Amino acid sequence: MIPGEILTEPGQIELNVGRPTLTIAVVNEGDRPIQVGSHYHFAEANNALVFDRELATGYRLNIPAGNAVRFEPGMRRTVELVAVGGERRIFGFQGKVMGALK
């Protein structure tokens, strides 16, 4: 074994199996690139991103942990979101939830 090496079982690793997902269109109407990380509550992302925030409440990007999606100015992109897991409580970000999701 090499120091720092990670050994995994053979086959593909499936992420977020069985969790609700949704696909939404997002447009960056700002003048600067915006990056959103894998575990950021998507409904509270930068206000220059235009999308259905009510629909996205309780969801995050369906991408591997530690990754991010970049939205260039004027760019329209479709992203897949996945429901937040665990106790489904959200704190911080823009402070719009601050507790349990409904």
Curated annotation (Swiss-Prot):
Database matches in CDD domains: Urease_beta
E.C. number: 3.5.1.5
GO cellular component, as recorded: urease complex
GO biological process: urea catabolic process
InterPro entries cross-referenced by the UniProt entry: Urease_beta-like (IPR002019), Urease_betasu_sf (IPR036461), Urease_subunit (IPR050069)
One GO MF term: urease activity
SUPFAM superfamilies: Urease, beta-subunit
Keywords for the protein's UniProt record, in alphabetical order: Cytoplasm, Hydrolase
Catalytic reactions of this protein: urea + 2 H2O + H(+) = hydrogencarbonate + 2 NH4(+)
Pathway(s) of this molecule: Nitrogen metabolism; urea degradation; CO(2) and NH(3) from urea (urease route): step 1/1
UniProt keyword annotation of NADP present: no
Subcellular location: Cytoplasm
Main location: cytoplasm
PANTHER family: UREASE (PTHR33569:SF1)
Family: Belongs to the urease beta subunit family.
Subunit relationships: Heterotrimer of UreA (gamma), UreB (beta) and UreC (alpha) subunits. Three heterotrimers associate to form the active enzyme.
Name this protein carries in UniProt: Urease subunit beta
Gene source species: Bordetella bronchiseptica (strain ATCC BAA-588 / NCTC 13252 / RB50) (Alcaligenes bronchisepticus)
